[in-house]
Amino acid sequence: MGKIIIQSLTTEKPISVMGMEAGICWGGDVTDEEKNYKRGLDCLQSGHLRTAEYPQVYMVLDGYSARVIREFYTHIAGGPTRLQASTRYINYKDFDCIVPPKVSKDPLATITYLEAIENTQTALQTLEKAGVPKEDSANLLPLGMATKVVVRTNLRNLIDMAHQRLCSRAYWEFRILMNDIIEALAYYSSEWENLVKQHKIFKPKCAVCGFCEEKYSCGAYPTKEQNDEYIKLGKLIKNKDFTSLLLYLTDEDKHNLVKLLSLEK
């Protein structure tokens, strides 16, 4: 697939930067690195993520499809900016194209897919010989074409992006892209490594809220409706409202509950 290059302009100590900025507002000592680090962790653990907009991430996304980059562009929180490889000035007559897994595992589908790419490349070369400018012939380029993007974003935006794009129902290439970004950040500095591996701040939304909001859940977490029922049952058990509780139980559940209550006595 593609690769992520974290640029040197990226904040090296994101946790400390968060703590320092928060400390200024709280009247704290911002000259002490250890205090800044602890304060930054407290912000993360308390969900005070406005401070997470201060750590900046500069990166190059290279070799991912134009299609997934279009989806990447929908994450606009925190004022990110980006530049994409030009289709006007760069010659794409021999462009690379992403082959989806469901295509590559089928020999006939693979042949059909690669032939379509080859036909497009041939058409681009023919148009070039006919004197058609690249900015016009580029209209033929497919969404699956590999491209390169320079991005500036921030920690908070990436946390939110992970909530959406690490979901098992997210587009497969974006899941790969998101994991590649996380892996590259973990390698960039020790504080980023702590954020990724120790504090695990990048996770799907179901792991954050404890239930799944998707209509077609993968089953890793209960749906919101199931979770609401569990909460109701928990309250009934806590209040020992057995009359209401019996309405939720099968005959086997009732038998097991009687056994459990007899053991407690």
Locate each region found by the language model.
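Family-specific signature for flavin-dependent thymidylate synthase
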Residues: 1-265
